[in-house]
Amino acid sequence: MIEADRLISAGTTLPEDVADRAIRPKLLEEYVGQPQVRSQMEIFIKAAKLRGDALDHLLIFGPPGLGKTTLANIVANEMGVNLRTTSGPVLEKAGDLAAMLTNLEPHDVLFIDEIHRLSPVVEEVLYPAMEDYQLDIIIGEGPAARSIKIDLPPFTLIGATTRAGSLTSPLRDRFGIVQRLEFYQVPDLQYIVSRSARFMGLEMSDDGALEVARRARGTPRIANRLLRRVRDFAEVKHDGTISADIAAQALDMLNVDAEGFDYMDRKLLLAVIDKFFGGPVGLDNLAAAIGEERETIEDVLEPYLIQQGFLQRTPRGRMATTRAWNHFGITPPEMP
């Protein structure tokens, strides 16, 4: 799939992204951006600690790369408890989830990434565990089968998903706290890039960090990934110091433009503009024009372009906006 090959794709985690764990914030006071989420979580965590309770179950959703796993780690650290991590696709059988739940200590946090991908069988086991801190297990088969209940310690389930709409209503309704992560503002990303540069021992100007932040598509994961590539360029082509000019040269070399678009983003927009006169164009025709699967366009290429106002979905098909025409220096046609 094309997503795995794109430097500016937040949906894939590259091996080098794992190294970012060392520079991730560990407490709320270190957490940058998402001011509403931060202020609310500070209150919820303090209240739970004052009562001596486990934090209520928490659902975190939003685009990939915005720090859902980081926030789960922060919650566990702030509560002073253990964090157990797994993901929806890994929990194939009810017994897999039961094994994790029975090993939790009081108030521990169980983090399930991609929770929308839980199988129905596993999800059924989760309901009484979340609601009553009980595990219902069926022993035996057929007429001899019987159900036993196992009491669980109070715990916090944190579910993370990029597709909140794919969650079933019974599961979604059992989360007492729901937080949506938004794309980051450029000043917050600039701070994150500068902080990462310090951790990496890099000499980087404020303008250099700003240049990387502007092209990071509002996503910390992409910002840190671009920073590593800019570092490589600065060390090989210059003296290792990262200025705005060096950052711009490096990112231009990587085909990441001022809007954070790469070759595939530009290819799609130019196809709509040049081949279909700005649209509307049907998804199948557009897929054929750029030689990509329609699923790739829908899931990988389109979302950011639509969010930033460069592409529009209409009942008749995709249309390039005036902003897209202006981005390429092309005069849009006059509206009839």
UniProtKB/Swiss-Prot annotation:
Has 3 domains, the large (RuvB-L) and small ATPase (RuvB-S) domains and the C-terminal head (RuvB-H) domain. The head domain binds DNA, while the ATPase domains jointly bind ATP, ADP or are empty depending on the state of the subunit in the translocation cycle. During a single DNA translocation step the structure of each domain remains the same, but their relative positions change. Residues 4-184 are annotated as: Large ATPase domain (RuvB-L). GO terms for molecular function: ATP binding; ATP hydrolysis activity; four-way junction DNA binding; four-way junction helicase activity. PANTHER family: HOLLIDAY JUNCTION BRANCH MIGRATION COMPLEX SUBUNIT RUVB (PTHR42848:SF1), PTHR42848. Mg(2+) binds at T69. It is found in: Cytoplasm. The keyword Transferase does not apply. Homohexamer. Forms an RuvA(8)-RuvB(12)-Holliday junction (HJ) complex. HJ DNA is sandwiched between 2 RuvA tetramers; dsDNA enters through RuvA and exits via RuvB. An RuvB hexamer assembles on each DNA strand where it exits the tetramer. Each RuvB hexamer is contacted by two RuvA subunits (via domain III) on 2 adjacent RuvB subunits; this complex drives branch migration. In the full resolvosome a probable DNA-RuvA(4)-RuvB(12)-RuvC(2) complex forms which resolves the HJ. It comes from Shigella boydii serotype 18 (strain CDC 3083-94 / BS512). GO terms for cellular component: cytoplasm; Holliday junction resolvase complex. The keyword Electron transport does not apply. It catalyses: ATP + H2O = ADP + phosphate + H(+). GO terms for biological process: DNA recombination; DNA repair. Keywords: ATP-binding, Cytoplasm, DNA damage, DNA recombination, DNA repair, DNA-binding, Hydrolase, Nucleotide-binding. Its EC number is 3.6.4.-. It comes from the Bacteria. Residues 258-336 are annotated as: Head domain (RuvB-H). Belongs to the RuvB family. ATP binds at I23, R24, G65, K68, T69, T70, E131, D132, Y133, R174, Y184, R221. InterPro entries: AAA+_ATPase (IPR003593), AAA_lid_4 (IPR041445), DNA_helicase_Holl-junc_RuvB (IPR004605), P-loop_NTPase (IPR027417), RuvB-like_N (IPR008824), RuvB_C (IPR008823), WH-like_DNA-bd_sf (IPR036388), WH_DNA-bd_sf (IPR036390). DNA binds at R294, R313, R318. Residues 185-255 are annotated as: Small ATPAse domain (RuvB-S). The RuvA-RuvB-RuvC complex processes Holliday junction (HJ) DNA during genetic recombination and DNA repair, while the RuvA-RuvB complex plays an important role in the rescue of blocked DNA replication forks via replication fork reversal (RFR). RuvA specifically binds to HJ cruciform DNA, conferring on it an open structure. The RuvB hexamer acts as an ATP-dependent pump, pulling dsDNA into and through the RuvAB complex. RuvB forms 2 homohexamers on either side of HJ DNA bound by 1 or 2 RuvA tetramers; 4 subunits per hexamer contact DNA at a time. This is Holliday junction branch migration complex subunit RuvB. SUPFAM superfamilies: P-loop containing nucleoside triphosphate hydrolases, Winged helix' DNA-binding domain.
